[in-house]
Amino acid sequence: MTRIGTPLSPTATRVLLCGCGELGKEVVIELQRLGVEVIAVDRYANAPAMQVAHRSHVVNMLDGVALRAVIEAEKPHYIVPEIEAIATATLVELENEGFNVVPTARATQLTMNREGIRRLAAEELDLPTSPYHFADTFEDYAKAVADVGYPCVVKPVMSSSGKGQSLLRSDADLQKSWDYAQEGGRAGKGRVIVEGFIDFEYEITLLTVRHVGGTTFLEPVGHRQEKGDYQESWQPQAMSPKALAESQRVAKAVTDALGGRGLFGVELFVKGDQVWFSEVSPRPHDTGLVTLISQDLSQFALHARAILGLPIPVVRQFGPSASAVILPEGQSQQTSFANLGAALSEPDTAIRLFGKPEINGTRRMGVCLARDESVELARAKATRASQAVKVEF
């Protein structure tokens, strides 16, 4: 039975969040609504989730010693990773010592890099994926490309938001794609995955919740990417019954193998009735921001309930919905957003401004949300709202 105490008292139920971006911010808000004491940790000050947590610490989360020191001092009941770039070996040690890592330390370790999760899906679970090879050197990479054939995709095994990812169509792309992957990798130069290109019709995120009552699948989320970054998402994505059933089968197999409780974002490629596994995040997904307007319980509310062992008897869908990012380019530590009245002038629209403390280049600073009679109308409405927002530096 779940018991939640009083924040900032000896009975408090404490959650320590590792990573404090816009997704973590929404998770903190949902935990706050349930009376949880939240400690936010990230590598820079005033990150979005820190602004709504009870307190925060600035720590390099790839530094296992520093991360352990904060966790041992705070003694949280739950450790909730919000990003991949964490000293996962330290999380494994802490879990073995009795700390509760969400969903599990193994899940955070396997999904920290593309190799662990790809080998689990393809080699252990025998799920359909694109053909792939891993490579550490340019020579091995060139051989992997020759084996996989053109067109193919190269990605660093460790990166986020599509950084370092590119499509190769001929030998002319070999060197520049290698260089781009090396620049985009989170740990600097290093290992890459070369994948055969799947001629898919569309890609989806199947948000999957493992909770005290079993597994719940949300309506499939369609999305559009540019340079590996999500630009817009919508729900529900139209699919054949066979493709939806296969997507749920694949998602359940992967999330069961990772274990624990929480929300997972399972990324899949779809063509007709065929489905291929791509990646999985053991946490809320950026494309799932659409659930802030599409459902009675957003992906963040569902994650909070699942973590705390609270039931999820039903999730109600409100109708066709979409999200469109606010993605300015500039340099500032005092960004302002204007023309919000125009952006919110249509019915069934909403805006989330993330409160990121600075921008240096292109950065996702907010998202516009919309609901309408069809996905097409919702997408158009969300895009109009996003384009109406004026970002001032």
Swiss-Prot record:
Mg(2+) binds at residues 267, 279. One of its GO terms (biological process) is 'de novo' IMP biosynthetic process. Residues 119-308 form the ATP-grasp domain. One of its GO terms (molecular function) is ATP binding. ATP binds at residues 114, 155, 160-165, 195-198, 203. Keywords: ATP-binding, Ligase, Magnesium, Metal-binding, Nucleotide-binding, Purine biosynthesis. It holds the Pfam family ATP-grasp. Pathway: Purine metabolism; IMP biosynthesis via de novo pathway; N(2)-formyl-N(1)-(5-phospho-D-ribosyl)glycinamide from N(1)-(5-phospho-D-ribosyl)glycinamide (formate route): step 1/1. N(1)-(5-phospho-beta-D-ribosyl)glycinamide binds at residues 22-23, 82, 286, 356, 363-364. Its EC number is 6.3.1.21. The keyword Cell inner membrane does not apply. It comes from the Bacteria. One of its GO terms (cellular component) is cytosol. It catalyses: N(1)-(5-phospho-beta-D-ribosyl)glycinamide + formate + ATP = N(2)-formyl-N(1)-(5-phospho-beta-D-ribosyl)glycinamide + ADP + phosphate + H(+). Belongs to the PurK/PurT family. Involved in the de novo purine biosynthesis. Catalyzes the transfer of formate to 5-phospho-ribosyl-glycinamide (GAR), producing 5-phospho-ribosyl-N-formylglycinamide (FGAR). Formate is provided by PurU via hydrolysis of 10-formyl-tetrahydrofolate. Homodimer. This is Formate-dependent phosphoribosylglycinamide formyltransferase. It comes from Pseudomonas putida (strain GB-1). The lineage of its organism: Bacteria, Pseudomonadati, Pseudomonadota, Gammaproteobacteria, Pseudomonadales.
